[in-house]
């Protein structure tokens, strides 16, 4: 057995909230064989398996009695290419932003709007991560996952993944599928998405009227760095709540009471609201209770000022949820996975 299983390991370095909880058992998977060994170990020792990547979409409310398996596999390769596009495959443990930069350096466009998002390649499809008008589903080709029930590998197409807003089949069947590697369809001819105002504005400020994918990536990195705190400095998991999608009738009611609300009509007739706007209107921006708080510049981000526990952060999130329901009749859904 090559898998190294350790006991009583602090997970503080492995979650971006910096919550100091302990894993009963911990191991890192650098290969498919390591993953299979971890599954076998969990069965043999009758212990559940918790798979993590970069820990950037995770809120740990207490010590974890599972075998925590951190995906640490690395590798980026082009598996198909022609004059217009390439299919790039990356191992699940590849850090996301460096992967995006590697693709840009290869002259491949499509991922630039997803620059500086924390996490790993394997976690990206689970959430169907998205930013500035682009989601994973827009550049996704296929992925390979291990069926934890049978031990067999399965290939997933775009349709198989059932991608939705910050959603996929893997989020609902997390105990079954373990993503090993992901393939992306990227273009050699850039089709830039500049419809989000801040991106265009930043490019204008830089005097760039004919941007390249690299330019877009740099602009988005600058915007994100200003808007979102660095987890290495201030513990956080990025946007903590999903932007709610509500019935048009409820939106009309809110609009009547709060004329400043901005809604984004959806294809199904519903309207998407900015969760950050709701939270800010309710007075939570900059709120702090001990070391758990809401960021002073970005109300969508909960932060750990140092020694907050996962339970304290969770309780704060629930208080915000209750207040938003009471004020607006809107339910906010948390983005991070709770354990």
From Swiss-Prot:
Keywords: Cell cycle, Cell division, Cell shape, Cell wall biogenesis/degradation, Cytoplasm, FAD, Flavoprotein, NADP, Oxidoreductase, Peptidoglycan synthesis. Residues 19-189 form the FAD-binding PCMH-type domain. It is found in: Cytoplasm. Cell wall formation. Its cofactor is FAD. Pathway: Cell wall biogenesis; peptidoglycan biosynthesis. It comes from the Bacteria. The keyword Oxidoreductase applies. InterPro entries: FAD-bd_PCMH, FAD-bd_PCMH-like_sf, FAD-bd_PCMH_sub1, FAD-bd_PCMH_sub2, MurB, MurB_C, MurB_C_sf, Oxid_FAD_bind_N. Its EC number is 1.3.1.98. One of its GO terms (biological process) is peptidoglycan biosynthetic process. It is an enzyme of class 1 (oxidoreductase). This is UDP-N-acetylenolpyruvoylglucosamine reductase. Coiled coil: none annotated. The active site is at residues 166, 239, 335.
């Amino acid at each position: 057995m090559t898998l190294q299983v350790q006991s009583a390991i602090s997970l503080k370095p492995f979650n971006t909230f910096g919550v100091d909880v302990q894993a009963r058992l911990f191991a890192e998977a650098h290969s498919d064989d390591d993953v299979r060994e971890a599954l076998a170990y969990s069965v043999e020792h009758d212990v559940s398996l918790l798979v993590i990547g970069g820990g950037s979409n995770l809120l740990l409310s207490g010590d974890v009695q599972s075998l925590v398996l951190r995906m640490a596999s690395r590798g980026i390769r082009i598996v198909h290419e022609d004059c217009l596009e390439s299919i790039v495959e990356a191992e699940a443990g590849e850090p996301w932003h460096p992967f995006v930069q590697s693709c840009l350096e290869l002259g491949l466009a499509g991922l630039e709007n997803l620059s500086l998002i924390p996490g790993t390649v394997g976690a990206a499809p689970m959430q169907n991560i998205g930013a500035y008008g682009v989601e994973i589903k827009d550049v996704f080709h296929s992925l390979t996952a291990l069926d934890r029930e049978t031990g067999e590998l399965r290939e997933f197409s775009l349709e198989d993944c059932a991608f939705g807003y910050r959603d996929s089949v893997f989020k609902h069947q997390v105990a079954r599928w373990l993503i090993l590697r992901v393939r992306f369809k990227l273009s050699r001819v850039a089709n830039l998405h500049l419809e989000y105002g801040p991106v265009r504005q930043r490019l204008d400020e830089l005097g760039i009227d004919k941007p390249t994918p690299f330019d877009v990536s740099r602009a988005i990195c600058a915007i994100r760095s200003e808007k979102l705190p660095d987890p290495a400095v201030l513990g956080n998991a990025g946007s903590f709540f999903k932007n709610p999608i509500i019935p048009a009738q409820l939106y009309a009611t809110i609009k009547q009471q709060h004329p400043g609300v901005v809604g984004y009509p959806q294809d199904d007739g519903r309207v998407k609201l900015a969760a950050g706007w709701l939270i800010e209107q309710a007075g939570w921006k900059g709120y702090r209770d001990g070391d758990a708080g809401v960021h002073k510049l970005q109300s969508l981000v909960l932060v750990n000022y140092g020694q907050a526990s996962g339970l304290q952060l969770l309780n704060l999130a629930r208080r915000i949820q209750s207040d938003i329901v009471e004020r607006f009749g809107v339910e906010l859904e948390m983005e991070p996975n709770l354990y």
